Amino acid sequence: MLNKRVIPCLDVNNGRVVKGTSFVNLRDAGDPVELAARYYREGADELVFLDISATTEERKTMAEVVEKVSKEVFIPLCVGGGLRSIADMTTLLRAGADKVSVNSAAVSDPDLISRGAEKFGRQCIVVAIDAKREGNSWQVYTHSGKKPTGLDAVEWAMKAEQLGAGEILLTSIDADGKNTGYDNELNREVGSRLNIPVIASGGAGSPEDLYNALDKGQADAVLAASIFHYGRYSIAEVKKYLKSKGLPVRLEN
């Protein structure tokens, strides 16, 4: 069985890491390079950077952040936020990213997934899906969870895989930032229909929440932010807990 991955998420705004609830009420969480280096030392399996300002000016700042981080950190880096073209992807991959994440642009231009996979390999292309529960299903929202698309999240994930996505980064808007656990029904519904890894996101408040997402939610990896940023738990503590519960994880010596 493949190791389950623990992935800190760093939302970057104006060159600083921030954290909010359901994409609003942002507060400062520190310097991206310092935090990335700390998480690398603690045993993170990968890092995800999301540029939540994503103006043209900020994209340059983000590329600079990625370049600095890639000199300090030797685990895979995935970078997303406002990527709209192959040129945007190229900029970040050249700066040192290993993977790029596309969200709103993939919904408006699904062929971007195929073009990215063709140019860089599907292992490089992560499709991020922000989903909100509506009755017995989940709708895809774009533009930082503000814009309903009418797309069913499970169907969109399946289509993204067909188009060439190498992974799905699945965020529950309902759970995001609330620290009360992941939407494991959503994780299971999506994961059971795909042959590519699903990264569960939104809702981590304790090591048990991460365990439940990997076990009950059947996710391949878990993304978490505030649980790590504010020092509530270290990555090493969380991974030791997951190991003690019988999950396969990579532990630092």
Curated annotation (Swiss-Prot):
Catalytic activity entry: 5-[(5-phospho-1-deoxy-D-ribulos-1-ylimino)methylamino]-1-(5-phospho-beta-D-ribosyl)imidazole-4-carboxamide + L-glutamine = D-erythro-1-(imidazol-4-yl)glycerol 3-phosphate + 5-amino-1-(5-phospho-beta-D-ribosyl)imidazole-4-carboxamide + L-glutamate + H(+)
Swiss-Prot/TrEMBL keywords: Amino-acid biosynthesis, Cytoplasm, Histidine biosynthesis, Lyase
Pathway note: Amino-acid biosynthesis; L-histidine biosynthesis; L-histidine from 5-phospho-alpha-D-ribose 1-diphosphate: step 5/9
Coiled-coil regions listed: none
Localization per record: Cytoplasm
CDD domains assigned to the protein according to its UniProt record, in alphabetical order: HisF
Top-rank EC class of the record's enzyme: lyase
Active site: 11, 130
Alphabetized SUPFAM superfamilies for the sequence: Ribulose-phoshate binding barrel
Source organism superkingdom: Bacteria
Protein name: Imidazole glycerol phosphate synthase subunit HisF
